[in-house]
Amino acid sequence: MIIHVTYLSGYITGIISSIIISAILGLPLAPERPARHSWTPSAIFPAPIIAMGLVAICIKLGVTGMYGGVDLGVVSGLLAALMTAYFLEDIFPRPEDL
């Protein structure tokens, strides 16, 4: 099974914590319009997606946390929000035509 029910709370905690911390760091909640041509990082995308990926990587490596993945979700949400706010455009630069 890809997502085990035991770690579902870790995924949900990662999503919620990444959105809250991203909003605290000053990222907009939604990207600018039109959304399909926007390269603005926001609290809704890509921070929660990165947090879910970090939780999945940690669970696959055997790091499950102490509280059913909730603590792992909070840490991954924090790392995802910091990465989205400060390092995302260094890793993935803006396209030239936008």
Swiss-Prot record:
One of its GO terms (cellular component) is plasma membrane. InterPro entries: Prd_NiFe_hyd_3_EhaA. The keyword Membrane applies. Coiled coil: none annotated. Its main location: membrane. The chain crosses the membrane at residues 7-27, 43-63, 72-92. It is found in: Cell membrane. The keyword NAD does not apply. It holds the Pfam family NiFe_hyd_3_EhaA. It is a multi-pass membrane protein. Keywords: Cell membrane, Membrane, Transmembrane, Transmembrane helix. Belongs to the EhaA family. Putative multisubunit membrane-bound [NiFe]-hydrogenase eha is composed of at least 20 subunits. One of the integral membrane subunits of multisubunit membrane-bound [NiFe]-hydrogenase eha. Eha is predicted to form large electron transfer complex and might catalyze energy-driven reduction of low-potential redox carriers (Potential). This is Probable [NiFe]-hydrogenase-type-3 Eha complex membrane subunit A. It comes from Methanothermobacter marburgensis (strain ATCC BAA-927 / DSM 2133 / JCM 14651 / NBRC 100331 / OCM 82 / Marburg) (Methanobacterium thermoautotrophicum). The lineage of its organism: Archaea, Methanobacteriati, Methanobacteriota, Methanomada group, Methanobacteria.
